[in-house]
């Protein structure tokens, strides 16, 4: 993605450091650089910096194609995209500065903790070299520090946060037009590195993605126009249908910054005003619902900025005492779509086959993972990260924490969706299940979401043998209810004991990720996702040998579920049997649970007395995290292909345990005053 260019003026060139802002329209960093003179467009691929959040296969496919279109657009304007492969982004920036004689660097803000620390380091290092560094907001309607309550404190509830955003005294900035022309800087001495985003074994699977998706900023703009002029009108009506193709499909475009959220907001508000003038109540309702999903995306960045550990630990301190079930067989059955609950299984098979899930199905499978199987929420979040086309750290963390109950405004922990009821709610005719579970395609609609209750004659007529060609339920809901009840009792006992120990002075609190140091909350230990087998992408292989994680910590944190129609409770045990295939798993061996460490401490964050209004539970997943589903055919579910290094760093109790993540976040707290950072010019 390199080419010959003209040169730099006496004032030097300006480097535009592209990251997740892969567009030429409404790109403040690019616009500022164009105004300053000759421009060098740069993308640095440094996945090692991301640790275990290296993009998965489908995300890398998207990134590859998005960069290609960005380079094409830049060439049409007069320059090109320089790509660098590195293990250190800041070092690469310095190299490009030296080889091009650039005097300024422009980039747009990111809000995840690793990026915050990296960007601060970049500003320090480059400024020390005499390079002017400027950064801009290109990803949010308002910067996180702009949205506060009357006392200047960050909000702890989404409803209050979004209400404040909509009532700000000034509107979000209007989107910028793309530049008409770019004067290119001299890159004759700056050799571009070829970037490899896929290997030969992945190309076959990736080729299928191109049939349904078109990455790139211009394609994202077309998708936005199509949505606003079509499906938006009935968004509120159709978005809850699991088999619906009427949602926006904008989430991957938003994640990679191909579409400006400001442009989305402004165009949707124009529609809102027009429909209000026409008295179109259905249209107004759809606009409000869609804007709320945009608000949830904003909130995910807001939470990540104000609580940089939110992708790794719960924000409600007592939930760290919940005894998570450490069961790799359950995890494997969930990934394979072999839980015995059709809606859950259909969703997991679609996820692997397409890299996509409707947000309602994301809620269902996540809820089942956490509440019925009671597996550690970070396992599920990491699997989503590896397999989703629109994997987004901030949005995924918000979604899993909300569903799991670890956000202050989550639903109660003892409530969960009944997959059978949810099936008839979101897939009333069973079309979605039949598409992704062909073994159930002949089952009548009356039984499609609970085949275990179907008469034997009906099963025989449909060619179904439960426990053979389709599994019985992996665990009964009554049993799950009892287990959850026991686990919650144990959690509260441990929390009370820890509080008593702290009050007696025999246990010392640890610092919280929040800025309120007087409300300590212990940093959780991580789950190690071991690469026990080499990556395989052969679709003909069975899915029994998918990779599974192992636990390294002595304490796994708990979470609550999102929306629910059933109270499920959990029992304590010692180990779980293999995934059942021939019988309902009602009397399995005791499940293994992580033992809570005696020295763990908890402290509730004072501001987090949270509740979310009932209707928000229907739409708790941000549009950036999910927005719809396209029609695709089902198929064999192959092995889990991990995105990159699956090593979760093992950490000691508290902050500063020696892991990469911990040291990054320590640095974040030591150096971060982002208000000052963002204004450094």
Curated annotation (Swiss-Prot):
UniProt organism field: Arabidopsis thaliana (Mouse-ear cress)
Name the UniProt record assigns to this protein: Cryptochrome-1
Phosphoserine, modified sites: 616
Consequence of substituting residue 380 to R: Constitutive light response
Gene label: CRY1
Outcome following mutation: residue 337 to D: Abnormal hypocotyl elongation in blue light
Region annotation Disordered: where it falls in the sequence: 525-598, 616-664
InterPro entries xref list: Crypto/Photolyase_FAD-like_sf (IPR036134), Crypto/Photolyase_N_sf (IPR036155), Cryptochr/Photolyase_FAD-bd (IPR005101), Cryptochrome/DNA_photolyase_1 (IPR002081), Cryptochrome_C (IPR020978), Cryptochrome_pln (IPR014134), DNA_photolyase_1_CS_C (IPR018394), DNA_photolyase_N (IPR006050)
Result after altering residue 347 to R: In hy4-15; reduced anthocyanin accumulation and abnormal hypocotyl elongation in blue light. Loss of dimerization and activity
Residues where Mg(2+) 1 binds: 238, 246, 358
Annotated ranges, domain Photolyase/cryptochrome alpha/beta: 12-141
Result after altering residue 611 to K: In hy4-24; reduced anthocyanin accumulation and abnormal hypocotyl elongation in blue light
Organism taxonomic ancestry: Eukaryota, Viridiplantae, Streptophyta, Embryophyta, Tracheophyta
Activity regulation (record text): Light exposure induces a conformational change in the C-terminal domain CCT1 required for activity.
Positions of ATP binding: 239, 359-360, 409
Modified residues (Phosphothreonine): 621
Compositionally biased tracts (Polar residues): 583-598
NCBIfam families: crypt_chrom_pln
Record note on what altering residue 283 to E does: In hy4-5; reduced anthocyanin accumulation and abnormal hypocotyl elongation in blue light
Keyword S-adenosyl-L-methionine attached: no
Reported impact of residue 581 to K: In hy4-23; reduced anthocyanin accumulation and abnormal hypocotyl elongation in blue light
Disulfide-bond pairs as recorded: 80-190
């Amino acid at each position: 993605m390199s080419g010959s260019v003209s040169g730099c003026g006496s004032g030097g060139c300006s480097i535009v450091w592209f990251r997740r802002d892969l567009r030429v329209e409404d790109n403040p960093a690019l616009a500022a650089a164009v105004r300053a003179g000759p421009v060098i467009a740069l993308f640095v691929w440094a996945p090692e910096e991301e640790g275990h959040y290296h993009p998965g296969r489908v995300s890398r496919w998207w990134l590859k194609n998005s960069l290609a279109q960005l380079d094409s657009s830049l060439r049409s304007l007069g320059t090109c995209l320089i790509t660098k492969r590195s293990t250190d982004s800041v070092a690469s920036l310095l190299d490009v500065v030296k080889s091009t004689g650039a005097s300024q660097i422009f980039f747009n803000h990111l809000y995840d903790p690793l990026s915050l620390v990296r960007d601060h380091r970049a500003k320090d290092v480059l400024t020390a070299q005499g390079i002017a560094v400027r950064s801009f907001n290109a990803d949010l309607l308002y910067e996180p520090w702009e949205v506060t309550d009357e006392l200047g404190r960050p909000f702890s509830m989404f409803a209050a946060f979004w209400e404040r955003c909509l009532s700000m005294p000034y509107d979000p900035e209007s989107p910028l037009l793309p530049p008409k022309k770019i004067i290119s800087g001299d890159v004759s001495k700056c050799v571009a590195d070829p970037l490899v985003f896929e290997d030969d074994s992945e190309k076959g699977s990736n080729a299928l993605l191109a049939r349904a998706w078109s990455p790139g900023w211009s394609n994202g703009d077309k998708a936005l126009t199509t949505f606003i002029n079509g499906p938006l009108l009935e968004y509120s009506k159709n978005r809850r249908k699991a088999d619906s193709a009427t949602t926006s499909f904008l989430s991957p475009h938003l994640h990679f910054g191909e579409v400006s959220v400001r442009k989305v907001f402004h165009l949707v508000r124009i529609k809102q005003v027009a429909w209000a003038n026409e008295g179109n109540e259905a249209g107004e309702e759809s606009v409000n619902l869609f804007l709320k999903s945009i608000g949830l995306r904003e909130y995910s960045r807001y939470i990540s900025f104000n609580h940089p550990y939110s992708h790794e630990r719960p924000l409600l301190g007592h939930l760290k005492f919940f005894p998570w079930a450490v069961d790799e067989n359950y995890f494997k059955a969930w990934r394979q779509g072999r839980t015995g609950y059709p809606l859950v299984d259909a969703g997991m098979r679609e996820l692997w086959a397409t890299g996509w899930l409707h947000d309602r199905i994301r809620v269902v499978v996540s809820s089942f993972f956490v509440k019925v199987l009671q597996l550690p929420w970070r396992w599920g979040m990491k699997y989503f990260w590896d397999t989703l086309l629109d994997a987004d750290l901030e949005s995924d963390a918000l979604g899993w924490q909300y569903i799991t109950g670890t956000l202050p405004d989550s639903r109660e922990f003892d409530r969960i969706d009944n997959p059978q009821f949810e099936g008839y709610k979101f897939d009333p005719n069973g079309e979605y299940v039949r598409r992704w579970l062909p073994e159930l395609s002949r089952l009548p609609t009356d039984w499609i979401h609970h085949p275990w209750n179907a008469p034997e004659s009906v099963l025989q007529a449909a060619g179904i043998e439960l426990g053979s060609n389709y599994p019985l339920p992996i665990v009964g809901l009554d049993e799950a209810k009892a287990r959850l009840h026991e686990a919650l009792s144990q959690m509260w006992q441990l929390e009370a004991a820890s509080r008593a120990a702290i009050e007696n002075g025999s246990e010392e609190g640890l610092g919280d990720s929040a800025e309120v140091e007087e409300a300590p909350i212990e940093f959780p230990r991580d789950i190690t996702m071991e690469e026990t087998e080499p990556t395989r992408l052969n679709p003909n292989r069975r899915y029994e040998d998918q990779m599974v994680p192992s636990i390294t910590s002595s304490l796994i944190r708990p979470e609550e579920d999102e929306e629910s129609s059933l109270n499920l409770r959990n029992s304590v045990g010692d180990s779980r049997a293999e995934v059942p295939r021939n019988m309902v798993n009602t009397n399995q061996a005791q499940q293994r649970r992580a033992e809570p460490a005696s020295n763990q401490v908890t402290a509730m964050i004072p501001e987090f007395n949270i509740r979310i209004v009932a209707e928000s539970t229907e739409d708790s997943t941000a549009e950036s995290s999910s927005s719809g589903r396209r029609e695709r055919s089902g198929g064999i579910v192959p092995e889990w292909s991990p995105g990159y290094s699956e090593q979760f760093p093992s950490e000691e109790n508290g902050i500063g345990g020696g892991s990469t993540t911990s040291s990054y976040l320590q640095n974040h707290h030591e150096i971060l005053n982002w208000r000052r950072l963002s204004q450094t010019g």
